[in-house]
C-alpha cells in the first residue's frame, strides 16, 4: 500500500489512516491510547504527540525487535494501569459498540472478550466459533468448505491477569496465545458484529477506504 511509512500511517485525504481509527475510539469514550510501535514508529509519535489535540492521552511502547502481536501487548503492559483494556490492530477500521464488549466480559465473567465478523467464504481464513451462550469454542480453525462463517475481527477486551501469562519474546496472539488459552480452559467469549469493516493491507481496500471517506461513509 505504502513503502515510506508504517501501513497505519498511510494517508487518506491528507490524514493518516490511524487518525480515523483513533477518532472512532474517542467517539466511543476511549481517551487513553498506547501505541505499540516498531518499524518507523517515531513517525507515529511525531504525528500524534501527546494526543491532546486529538482528544486522547497517548503513550508509546517501542519494540527493539519485532515481538509479534502478543509480545507487543506484553511490551505495552508497563503503561497499562487498568485491570482491563482494549486491543486492536492499527491497520483495520471496525465500527463496533465497545460498551457491548464490556458488558459481555462482565456478564460471562470472561478473561477476554473478542469481536467476530461474518464472511461469505470462511475457507479463506481461520474460523472462530462461538457457542449459543457466547463462549469461544474454536479459533483459527481451518476448513476446506467454501461457506459463510465467522472469523476473528481483531478487537479484544482483555483482563490484565491474562496479559501477565504472555511469555517474553516474539509471540503471536492469534496463533500462539488464544489457542493456548482455549486449551487451558480460560474463559474467552465474544459476539458477531456487522458494523463497517476494512483492512487496508490490500490496495483495493485502501482505495475503497479513500472513497468511503470522500463519500462521508467514514468521518
Residue map of PLM features:
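N-terminal glycine-rich phosphate-binding loop and ensuing alpha1 helix
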Residues: 1-45
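A structural signal for short hydrophobic beta-strand segments in well-ordered beta-sheet cores
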Residues: 9, 128-130, 178, 190
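Conserved beta-strand scaffold positions in the cores of enzyme catalytic domains, especially
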Residues: 9, 60, 112, 188-190
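A generic structural signal for residues located within well-ordered alpha-helices
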Residues: 13, 68-71, 153, 173
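Residues at the starts of beta-strands that form the adenosine-phosphate
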Residues: 31-33, 57, 111, 187
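Active-site phosphate/pyrophosphate- and oxyanion-stabilizing loops and adjacent acidic/basic residues
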Residues: 42, 74, 179
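Conserved beta-loop-beta/alpha segment of the NTase-like Rossmann-fold superfamily
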Residues: 45-46, 50-132, 165-167
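Catalytic-core segments of class I nucleotidyltransferases/pyrophosphorylases
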Residues: 84-86, 93, 99-106, 120, ...
